Structures are given as C-alpha cells and as structure tokens.
Swiss-Prot record:
This is Large ribosomal subunit protein uL16. Transmembrane segments: none annotated. GO terms for molecular function: rRNA binding; structural constituent of ribosome; tRNA binding. It comes from the Bacteria. It comes from Parafrankia sp. (strain EAN1pec). Part of the 50S ribosomal subunit. CDD domains: Ribosomal_L16_L10e. Belongs to the universal ribosomal protein uL16 family.
Length: 138
C-alpha cells in the first residue's frame, strides 16, 4: 500500500475538490493513460487495486506508471461517539484528484491490450475516467 513514511502533521484540513487539475494533465512517460473526468478522493487501496487489475491483464509485457500518490490523511471518529472532543484519528490515506489529471500510464503493449487493461482499472476507481493516447485524446 502507498502510505507516506513520515509526515509533519498527522491530521490535515480537507482540501477543496473544485476546479481543474493545474499540473499532470499530459502524458509524461507511457503511450497510453487514464485521465480523470471528475474530482474525487482516491484511496491507497483503490490505487493498488487498479494497478493489480492492469498488470494482471498485460501479464509480463508493458510497464505501468502511477502518477498519483495518497499523501492526505482522512480522519474518522469511532462509532457511537458523542460530538466534540477533538478530531478523529487518521483512518486512511487519499490522493485529491481533480478533472484532467493523468493518473496511470502504460507502455510496451498493443493498443487493444492497453485499452482493455485500462478499462479494468477504471472500474476500480471512484470517478469517471477516460482512456487517452499520446497521439491525441480519446
């Protein structure tokens, strides 16, 4: 699982999920990519699940790059706890993904194989995404 080793502060404010992605909107490493169309929190488990779905489909061929990292803790208070008495403890780590962000990249396989691998990975993610190629768009 992707989790930061050391953090300056255990708890953070919730980031805004509005607006488009400022960076990471172009394919940097691979030939094919998954681009987000909505904003969402993507947990470390969802990232790992999508990675496994892709790598199992492409088998030995190809290389996968993960361009998002879950660097924000989300907190939760225990069940049946009264209101107040501080913020809850960190439960899971999320990446704040905005529309237009390239999340996963893939190269070294044919386009039909890449399209199917990415389709399987998209089903593991909590927002609408699309398959894009380096040549241009969907």
């Amino acid at each position: 699982m992707l989790i930061p080793r050391k953090v300056a502060h255990r708890k953070q404010h919730h980031p805004k999920r509005t607006g488009a992605a400022k960076g990471g909107t172009r394919i940097a490493f691979g030939e094919y990519a998954i681009q987000s169309l909505e904003s969402a929190y993507v947990t470390n488990r969802q990232i790992e699940s999508a990675r496994i779905a892709m790598t199992r489909h492409i088998r030995r061929g190809g290389k996968v790059w993960i361009n998002i990292y879950p660097d924000r803790p989300l907190t939760k208070k225990p069940a049946e706890t009264r209101m107040g008495s501080g913020k809850g403890s960190p439960e899971w780590w999320v990446a704040n993904v905005k529309p237009g962000r390239i999340m996963f990249e893939l190269s070294g396989v044919a386009e039909p194989v890449a399209r199917e691998a990415m389709r399987r990975a998209i089903h593991k993610l909590p927002m609408k995404c699309r398959f894009v190629t380096r040549e241009g768009g969907a």
